[in-house]
């Protein structure tokens, strides 16, 4: 849109970390481009790219973090609320161990917001991530809450976030275990109403399993009787 020259290197078209080291790939691409965005799995890969590229490297998504999504989500919350960011309360409900749960917790803490995680304790962010969030909150005045009760998490919030319950690369068998753990953390009209805020808004980084109109959605309905998974 802005007239930049863009090259897309798909996984099968790059030898990064396979026949060519990440360090060498970073040095070559850094001589050819003004910036690099990496979207993949390991956080250590994007950090090594940033160490050796010599140009800005953007994290488009890793297993651990999704910072570019946070830029979009912070802007969206600001645009759709009359409050400044440090007065906004939001909750993330669902599996909070991966990039969206980690990143939203740290975003809220860094921006001085009232951020809540609602999930079974087994699916909370790691102790290291929680400690980082609490340390940031001490500096910014943020309020950080983690609870195993979905209704408690959403009480009084302005926004409710969620994400898929089974991530890319996880086996199909994971669904049964994850649904058993998270069924009470689905975002439903009842959970939205539990916020007590008639203007509460729902956010999802997408794609969402919210109905039967996909192959996975239909399989989940036939197997588990759910029309929609993390949201319905």
Swiss-Prot record:
The keyword Amino-acid biosynthesis applies. L-ornithine binds at residues 99, 163, 167-168. GO terms for cellular component: cytoplasm. One of its GO terms (biological process) is arginine biosynthetic process via ornithine. It comes from the Bacteria. GO terms for molecular function: amino acid binding; ornithine carbamoyltransferase activity. Pathway: Amino-acid biosynthesis; L-arginine biosynthesis; L-arginine from L-ornithine and carbamoyl phosphate: step 1/3. Keywords: Amino-acid biosynthesis, Arginine biosynthesis, Cytoplasm, Transferase. Belongs to the aspartate/ornithine carbamoyltransferase superfamily. OTCase family. NCBIfam families: orni_carb_tr. This is Ornithine carbamoyltransferase. It comes from Neisseria animalis. The gene is argF.
